[in-house]
Amino acid sequence: MHKLGIISFLFSCLFLFSCGTNKEKIVCYGDAKSNLAQLLTDEGYQLQFCSSVAEAIQKAPEQSPVLLLAPSYPEKGTVVTSEDLNLIQSKALRVFMDYPQQIGKNMCVKTDTMVLERVVVCDSLTPQLPAMSLMCFHRCILKEFDQAPDSTYLVAAKVAGFDNAVYGLANTPVHPLLYQQNNQLMVAATSVSNFATSRYLPEQRVQSMFEYIMNWLLQKQDVTFSSWPTYVSPSYSATEQLPKDAGKQSIAKGVEWYYNAHLLVHPSWKKDWADKYMGDGLAPVGPELPADMPDGDGSLGVLEGHMSSIYYDGKQQYRYWMRDDVQGESSYAFAAAGDLLGKQDYLKVSSNLLDYSFREYRDSVRNNPKSPSYGLLGWAYTHKGTYYGDDNARSILGSLAASSIMNSTSWDKQIVECIVGNFRTTGKNGFRGGNILDPDLQKNGWRHYFNSDLVNLHPHFESWNWACYLWLYEQTKYQPLLDRVKKGVSLMMAGYPNDWNWTNGIQQERARMILPLAWLYRVEPTDQHKQWLQFMTEELLKNQVACGGIREELGDESKSMFGCTPSNDAYGRTEASLIFKNGDPVA
């Protein structure tokens, strides 16, 4: 009898515990498999899905919560009729609906896709959602109505800023995104219920938004979520001890990314995908490749990669552009991974990429010994007559590293000819400038550039060519290579920081100086060269934070190519730094 009593007591405790974990019952309509439905179920809420909006509103007890979620986003919006509105009012329900097609007599008058717009918090909602803070609902599709809502919490607008709208909502169109239609009805103008699939960011703010919505829906003040669904997360936490082979694992994952993303061009899809979307190179953007597409072996090159643009369903756009610097850099990645991991397939891809690079981007006048363009590598498949020194240098640095790892001399001639081609278009002071166009080079001849007095205090464009020149000097002891680099580096260091030009951030410019300074000390180890290297390294590391990342920094705005975005209207028109002001946490 004593045992039966204990068992009965344990079952009672288990029953009470299970009851305690079940939270409010919520009547719902829409996609029962959505991220929001799954989250609420995992959190212990009891969701009762109905087959129609009318059924959900009719079945909901008075003063209870109702969720009306988009049944098929983006094809079909949610419809609430006038009868539904009347019943919501009479029963004093709290209703949240997303992606509305109709609200009473008001019909959606416009369906629009956000492109450059971000989500702006109008007034402070939570500590994580202060006024003017930003979220990204990537290319979400908005439903707009003529009738103004009672209260607007979030709007979609094209605004400048890193994590807040620094210029406010002035001089930019705004579109209500989360608002209260009346006391009983809160509306999201897009579908927010698949927030994880759609990769809405940042996650902490999206979570806080839903906690705010749920507190309103349940008429509470303490709703929080114990977990949060995500499809992208770090491999390790900030405090987790790394395994001994963490570096090796990261390299293995890094090179497999090329295959997971299908970046190696395959002959079966080259014409219908790579060539089609590359076009003339001005907007070489298209949808991601289907998951079942085969991967190439490097003999047709590697795509530039992903765009930052994400579609409403979480898929990401591709840059179907074929750039030569990508070929050289990727060949290095495959060679390093192949050597470390013992993967002959990776080494073969590396070799094929180098063959492709020198075959495809050194054609025509670039392969004619009598041409002033001889040895140079074209910037891209669509812009072979544009010669950026920094792009040539990136390709050559990758080629040098890959060929060294593979212990191959197959590309030595092309590598040296490319370095010389760049050097003979470098002026007396050691500077080459941004880019040289082939028509100008054919007209002027290479001596025009070799004898110029150009000074260009812009490491982005100059520094890695210097590293290439110094590498060639070490092999040949050809004195003009060293002399021109020393002249250029001396002027560059003397002009730091006030006279430096910068592209997307001053930290990137500092970082680019490390390699040529290291090579300069290697080939001529003087106290001055050592001091320069130490100084620039210390300048770079001033912004290193506890996790090891080196924070980006903006320089003198008057010296920038793409600096701080000056207005809401200017946002998204050009390249820009990832940060808006110094201190923004971006490495």
Mark where each language-model region is.
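Carbohydrate-active enzymes and regulators
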Residues: A32-K33, D42-Y45, A60-P61, P65-V66, ...
